[in-house]
Amino acid sequence: MIRKTIILLLFIIVSITWGTTFIAIRIASDTIPPLCITGMRFLLASFFLIFLCFYTKTPLLFPSNKKIFQLIICIFYFSLPFLLILYGGRYVNSTIASVIFAIMPIIVLFLSFIFFNKKLYFFQFIGLVLAIIFLSIILFKEIELGDEKTIKGVIALLLAMTSHAIIYLYSKEKYSNISILTFNALPSLLSGLFFLVISNILEHPKFDNFSNISILATFYLSYFSGVFGILSYFYLQKKVSAFQASTIFFIFPIINLMLEEFVWGNSIGIDQLQLIVFLMSSILITIFPFDLKNFMRFIKNFKK
């Protein structure tokens, strides 16, 4: 009973933190420049992660023969993707942005099939194709309503999501023995310093202009959405199957959609909503480990 309660709480926490991330970014960016937000977010999170490393006696550095991958994580999992997210988020609706990141499980599945020869079931392939089709239609409609900057924003978000997926997959396959604290602590610190230096050069942030609500949103992004959300998700992955953990990607865009309408009164058209539902259903089909042969065998045995 206690185990089920913990799993349910973890599921709720991760769904809420991920579903509110783009909303919190928008609130924080009301008075804080975007590069500065990201720098503060990573830097604040890194302090707590480094403290946890010392408290739990977890190494900050990767093993000597794997240190280069720690730098790769810093660049391609933190700095570059979040730079692209900042750019894309300026020109793409937050609901559409969350939908783009919702397809990450199927991108990971597809890349696993391509690079690591992981088995891809027939229905997973069908779900993958359908998800790509529905996402393409959704993005085409979003671009149709926008302009050239919207196209660039969509491309930036797709590149950010793909970069995340590649590093996540590679680290899972090759570096699964690395602690999640080690994985995040120093890359967060270095990325935070990088963004703050760039922000100071390009944005010239003035602390006096920061509103209390924007500062609170930044702390929320750092600790609740960042540290707490990430640690909860990785802990959840150890408690449940990959399929059960991946259903969060099905839930958090819906939370974002509801909050977008509740906070700002922004709603999407019924056609676009239907497409999102179809896309989410396709994702569910793709991440569900359904084997047609086993299913047919079950039907035959059932008839007997």
UniProtKB/Swiss-Prot annotation:
Subcellular location: Cell membrane
Residues covered by the EamA domain: 16-140, 162-288
Membrane topology summary: Multi-pass membrane protein
Pfam families: EamA
Family affiliation: Belongs to the EamA transporter family.
PANTHER family linked to this entry: INNER MEMBRANE TRANSPORTER (PTHR32322), PROTEIN PAGO (PTHR32322:SF14)
Designated name of the protein: Uncharacterized transporter in trpA 3'region
